[in-house]
């Protein structure tokens, strides 16, 4: 009997040893396949990092670029003489702005006014503010609806803008790398439509198909939470169709969405994740880090991680396991510092640092952007990285540029762009309630391959980012009337003709001013 037990243990031991060898071989093969997929690109970019921020119109941050006021006591900004022309606010618009009966000109907000109210940026309200191309109804329709908002004149605040003495880092990145002054939200509306457009070029396909003021004709027009997320509350929806994650998976290309506060702080009695991490913004107000409706992949069952499960190991970050490519922001750094940077990474700041008016601000946002970019520039992969800074919506902030309307809609309840309460007439190649393009948003590309001190005037939108991913890794289009098929290219912001062009730029997170620049 003892001999039999010994034999079984011996056999078991051998089996376990063989199993371990097989598993190690599988992991090695997975890593080798991931490396191979990263290396097969159609440009010099092998790693793409998309930093997706919140609620800023182009004029709100770049109205007077590259000319800053430079008052005493604020970080100084001096532009390069080589700075090209930018479509910002003209002297006429600054002093004689057409905005209906309110007669309020755009005005500068200083660093002491960094905490502002949240403007009205709902799908119908933004269209009404643009008033069929007259752009004269922002105060009437896009001003804050918060009765407690008294900052900078309450309704007038929507006309406010920051300059290079507050958003100093972004202005310095624009000086050193490439920016666009002609990039737009894919459609009008708030955060969730913007996030869905970023990953799928599509806001149609929601279930339920109609929820008052939230989903219309199967199209998302507001901010419901994702159904497949333990941390969601209130109105929840699911999305159908493909997104950029599903087609990256089909080609075995590593990727991930990394969001602040995604890691659970505890679990409920029935095992549901609790997202309870909190930070204070510069005003001392506590904000929960995780915002469910800012996490677009959680609307899709195929890419959701409902219980916020961690990756099984660092080596699996970017690959398919129980995390389903949805991670805490800390997992991005765990992967990067262990030589496992995914080919495509989407980074989402915690709530207090995402730039969203009402609970975040440009100074907290600058801390996140600069700390993140400084750190990425020190990675060994920097030589083949492109960082894209993009935004989900405008928050309703004034911008003087009328977007080209490439997708029309005629929902009489929610489409308000034209005097007839329409956004043109829906056609075969468009779903209802997808009026767009929407407001103009900032877009910057930071990379060794960025053109330097460059301003791109090509028309692009949020789906131009997924078009770059599709083209660079040979994925094909998403289909189902996704806007990726219509998107302009961001390639003009980069130059791959004769090697890297732009040197590293290290900034101070507090001031946004340059601390060190070096080649390589």
Regions of interest found by a model, annotated:
Residues 1-4:
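Positively charged n-region of N-terminal signal peptides that target proteins for export
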Residues 11-25:
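Bacterial N-terminal signal peptides
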Residues 28-520:
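N-terminal pro-sequences and low-complexity stem/linker regions of secreted or lumenal proteins
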């Amino acid at each position: 009997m003892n001999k039999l037990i010994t034999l079984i243990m011996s056999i078991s031991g051998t089996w376990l040893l063989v199993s371990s060898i097989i598993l190690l071989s599988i992991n090695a093969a997975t890593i080798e396949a991931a490396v191979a997929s990263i290396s097969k690109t159609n440009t010099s970019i092998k790693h793409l990092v998309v930093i997706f921020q919140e609620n800023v119109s182009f004029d709100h941050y770049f109205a007077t670029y590259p000319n800053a006021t430079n008052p005493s006591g604020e970080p100084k900004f001096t532009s390069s003489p080589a700075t090209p022309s930018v479509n910002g606010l003209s002297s006429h618009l600054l002093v004689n702005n057409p905005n209906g009966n309110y007669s309020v000109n755009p005005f500068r907000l200083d660093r002491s006014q960094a905490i502002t109210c949240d403007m009205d940026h709902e799908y119908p309200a933004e269209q009404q503010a643009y008033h069929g191309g007259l752009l004269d109804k922002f105060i009437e329709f896009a001003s804050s609806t918060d009765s407690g908002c008294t900052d900078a004149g309450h309704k007038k605040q929507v006309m406010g803008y920051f300059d290079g003495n507050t958003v100093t880092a972004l202005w310095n990145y624009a000086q050193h790398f490439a920016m666009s002054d002609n990039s737009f939200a894919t459609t009008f509306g708030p955060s969730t439509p913007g996030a869905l457009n970023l990953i799928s070029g599509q806001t149609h396909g929601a279930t339920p198909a109609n929820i008052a003021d939230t989903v219309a004709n199967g199209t998302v027009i507001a901010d419901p939470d994702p159904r497949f997320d333990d941390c969601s509350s209130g109105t929840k929806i699911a999305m159908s169709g493909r997104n950029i994650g599903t087609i990256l998976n089909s080609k075995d290309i590593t990727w991930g969405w990394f969001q602040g506060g995604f890691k659970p702080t505890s679990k409920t009695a029935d095992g549901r994740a609790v997202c309870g991490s909190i930070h204070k913004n510069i005003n001392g107000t506590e904000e929960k880090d995780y915002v469910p409706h800012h996490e677009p992949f959680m609307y899709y069952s195929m890419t959701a991680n409902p219980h916020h499960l961690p990756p099984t190991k660092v080596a699996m970050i970017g690959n398919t396991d129980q995390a389903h490519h949805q991670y805490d922001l800390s997992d991005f750094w765990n992967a990067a510092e262990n030589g496992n940077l995914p080919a495509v990474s989407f980074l989402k700041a915690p709530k207090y640092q995402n730039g969203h008016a009402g609970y975040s601000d440009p100074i907290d946002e600058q801390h996140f952007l600069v700390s993140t970019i400084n750190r990425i520039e020190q990675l060994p992969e920097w030589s083949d990285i492109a960082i894209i800074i993009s935004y989900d919506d405008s928050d309703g902030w004034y911008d003087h540029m009328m977007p080209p309307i490439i997708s029309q809609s005629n929902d009489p309840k929610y489409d308000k762009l034209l005097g007839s309460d329409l956004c043109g007439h829906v056609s075969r190649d468009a779903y209802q309630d997808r009026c767009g393009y929407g407001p103009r948003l900032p877009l910057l590309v930071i990379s060794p391959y960025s053109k330097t001190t460059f301003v791109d005037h090509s028309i692009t939108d949020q789906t131009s980012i997924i078009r770059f991913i599709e083209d660079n890794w040979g994925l094909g289009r998403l289909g189902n009337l996704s806007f990726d098929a219509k998107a302009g290219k961001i390639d003009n912001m980069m130059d791959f003709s004769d090697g890297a062009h732009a040197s590293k730029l290290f900034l101070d997170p507090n001031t946004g001013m340059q601390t060190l620049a070096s080649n390589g």
